[in-house]
């Protein structure tokens, strides 16, 4: 259901936005961890895709740039786990 944001006070709007951003970051970390495990298991290739990139574009319907950024972030965080905490 779509919320009428014009009904929110300034403070409510700011608080709501901050909450959404926190949730979004949490989901991003979870998404990257899932991609990391998929990459480790080579599940995209096992599922018939030439690469994790192709899986992300075709199956997850990410734009090419989004797929590339997420895969790069996933692989960097796999090498340097501290990156997850920075997100």
Where are these regions (language model features)?
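N-terminal acidic-hydrophobic amphipathic loop/helix motif that frequently occurs adjacent to catalytic
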Residues: 1-60
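Amphipathic alpha-helical "recognition" segments
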Residues: 49-87
């Amino acid at each position: 259901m779509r919320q009428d944001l014009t009904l929110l006070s300034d403070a409510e709007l700011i608080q709501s936005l901050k909450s959404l951003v926190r949730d979004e970051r949490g989901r991003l970390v979870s998404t990257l961890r899932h991609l990391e495990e998929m990459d480790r298991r080579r599940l995209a290739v096992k599922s018939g895709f030439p690469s994790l990139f192709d899986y992300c574009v075709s199956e997850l319907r990410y734009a090419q740039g989004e797929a590339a950024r997420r895969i790069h972030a996933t692989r960097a965080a796999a090498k340097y786990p501290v990156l997850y905490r920075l997100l």
